[in-house]
């Protein structure tokens, strides 16, 4: 709908330039745009599919556990708003500075983003860990659902801290056109760490949502290590090419 409205405005509004049918065609820039955007789109698609798989693992534990996980997921989505916003703004800011030839400021922005994210992440961590049951209780009055939701949040809580680091690094690499690497490290986290760990924890006797929730911060920590190693490699490669 927004695209249609934009097109109507372009047609009706007096612009300082003209648009013709010939302007809408494939050009050499399209390949570059696809090279940047497709890896991110694929990663996002597979990440969402992994959440469906995680939901299936939890559903094996029964209706109460599934309901608790569903309620906890709402709180998780809210907790991830600030890291996600930092990642998106980081990518734009870094890209502008890289385009201006100011790589030093781009690196500083990544460190600043990590610092800001950690402040909010630690605050959310304490809130979720100490008052997670109160937060879950906002969405469900059932004490068993509240208990199960709180169990998951206790395992997930460290994710609010480590995500602040990972998302700022991901935003930095996105701004430097390293989207293929961003996709690669995301798939490694999801396919090789998060899903196997969550599945393994879900099939244990007396499976705990806390241990299943831990799969998120563990996989994110692996992602941080991978990104640090790639940052060192990429920085050396960039200096050598210059």
Language-model segments: which ranges?
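Short runs within selected transmembrane alpha-helices of multi-pass transporters and secretion channels
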Residues: 1-6, 84-87, 156-175, 181-193, ...
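Short alpha-helical transmembrane segments in multi-pass integral membrane proteins
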Residues: 1-38, 94-159, 202-242
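Hydrophobic faces of transmembrane alpha-helices in multi-pass small-molecule transporters and flippases
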Residues: 2-5, 25-53, 57, 78, ...
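Interfacial/gating helices of multi-pass transporter permease domains
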Residues: 29-36, 40, 57-77, 143-150, ...
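Hydrophobic alpha-helical transmembrane segments of integral membrane proteins
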Residues: 35-36, 79-80, 91, 192-193, ...
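Transmembrane alpha-helix boundary and packing residues in multipass membrane permease domains
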Residues: 40, 44, 52, 56, ...
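Helix-terminus/linker motif at the lipid-water interface of multi-pass membrane proteins
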Residues: 45-78, 96-97, 134-143, 202-204
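Small-residue-rich hydrophobic transmembrane alpha-helices
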Residues: 68-132, 163-185
């Amino acid at each position: 709908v927004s695209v249609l409205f934009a097109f109507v405005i372009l047609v009706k509004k007096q612009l300082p330039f003209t648009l013709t049918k010939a302007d809408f065609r494939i050009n050499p820039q399209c390949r570059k745009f696809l090279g940047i955007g497709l890896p991110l789109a694929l990663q996002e698609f597979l990440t969402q599919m992994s959440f469906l798989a995680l939901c299936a693992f939890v559903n094996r534990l029964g209706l109460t556990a599934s309901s608790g996980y569903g309620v906890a997921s709402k709180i998780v989505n809210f907790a991830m708003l600030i890291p996600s916003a930092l990642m998106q703004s980081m990518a734009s800011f870094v890209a502008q500075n890289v385009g201006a030839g100011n790589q030093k400021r781009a690196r500083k922005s990544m460190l600043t983003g990590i610092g800001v994210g950690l402040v909010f992440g630690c605050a959310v961590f304490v809130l979720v860990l100490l008052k997670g049951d109160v937060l879950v209780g906002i969405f469900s009055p059932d004490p068993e659902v509240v208990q199960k939701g709180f169990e998951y949040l206790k395992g997930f809580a460290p994710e609010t801290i480590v995500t602040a680091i990972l998302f700022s690094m991901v935003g930095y690499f996105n701004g430097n056109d390293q989207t293929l690497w961003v996709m690669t490290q995301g798939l490694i986290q999801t396919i090789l760490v998060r899903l196997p760990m969550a599945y393994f924890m879900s099939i244990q006797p007396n499976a705990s949502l806390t241990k299943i929730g831990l799969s998120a911060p563990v996989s994110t920590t692996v992602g941080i290590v991978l990104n640090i190693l790639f940052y060192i490699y990429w920085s050396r490669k960039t200096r050598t090419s210059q």
